[in-house]
Amino acid sequence: MNSFTQQIKVSRQQSEIQSFYEPALRVLGHLFEVKKQNLRNKGYDENNAAITREEFSQTMAQRFRINQWLAGQIVNSLANADLVQKFGGYVKPKVGVHE
């Protein structure tokens, strides 16, 4: 019975995290456009635009009124679901996933 309740808890946690996918991708898209515009204004290649995981997590925590831990879990879950590119301490939207 203990493992059953643990499975339910994990399932609920996954559902909670996945419910943030769409709003998180919107936030990421907005941050990405701002970064691209900044690079464009400075004359650099906008293909180099990326958002730090920390900035993305903090923005989600502020906008969605969630804690940093949950925001980090959302970032990791998005990467595991192959909805964002995660490299080093940076993330960026996958091409064609959310436009």
Regions found by a protein language model. Name each.
Residues L31-V34, R63, A81:
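Surface-exposed polar/charged interaction patches
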Residues A79-G89:
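A short, conserved structural fragment
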Residues M1-F4, K42-E46, I66, G88:
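Eukaryotic partner-binding/assembly regions in large regulatory complexes
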Residues E54, G89-E99:
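Short, cationic-aromatic polyanion-contact patches
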Residues R40-T59:
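Short acidic, hydrophobic short linear motifs in intrinsically disordered regions
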